[in-house]
Amino acid sequence: MKKKVLAIALVTVFTGMGVAQAADVTAQAVATWSATAKKDTTSKLVVTPLGSLAFQYAEGIKGFNSQKGLFDVAIEGDSTATAFKLTSRLITNTLTQLDTSGSTLNVGVDYNGAAVEKTGDTVMIDTANGVLGGNLSPLANGYNASNRTTAQDGFTFTIISGTTNGTTAVTDYSTLPEGIWSGDVSVQFDATWTS
């Protein structure tokens, strides 16, 4: 009888042990978008970005991807105007890492092969000198109409420089700290109607 009880106890112990189960592994991330809404159909010049920028580091090229940033331009015509000029100038372009490292990235902006810089204006349209704006040409044709004219075009955005701590420049982006950088890239547009 003792042997039977012992055998049943052993079977129960081995059955209770079972095979080790692998635990499920899950991960979760949250993406957050800043959101605002604005409508302006009365200003002489309205420029609206059509999307946002998201740069991703690519290990294979040890760099960040470039982005095409589209924008919409609307102008109010001036029937007394004989010429029209539209220029752009870079205002802000620094992204800062969201930790305590102080690491920064600078974003370069290019319009049809010309750098948009903080130190001077980039001419996009200048009807007096035959610069008709490529994709923005509807503005060059409608600046002296009695209604509003719109056109769309885009900038090319690239990461042009970075620092590990806000001061120490990097030449190899693979040496940047891991993390997320955030900030604004702002471009000022100036329109001039000449009468």
From Swiss-Prot:
Induction: Negatively regulated by H-NS. Positively regulated by IHF and EcpR.
Assigned keywords, A-Z: Fimbrium, Signal
A Pfam family: MatB
Cellular component GO terms, alphabetical: pilus
InterPro entries (alphabetical): EcpA (IPR016514), Fimbrillin_EcpA_sf (IPR038478)
Signal peptide: 1-22
Protein location: Fimbrium
Subcellular location, principal: other
Superkingdom field: Bacteria
Family: Belongs to the EcpA/MatB fimbrillin family.
Quaternary structure and partners: Self-associates. Forms filaments. Interacts with EcpD.
Function, as annotated: Part of the ecpRABCDE operon, which encodes the E.coli common pilus (ECP). ECP is found in both commensal and pathogenic strains and plays a dual role in early-stage biofilm development and host cell recognition. Major subunit of the fimbria.
Record protein name field: Common pilus major fimbrillin subunit EcpA
Organism placement in taxonomy: Bacteria, Pseudomonadati, Pseudomonadota, Gammaproteobacteria, Enterobacterales
Name of encoding gene: ecpA
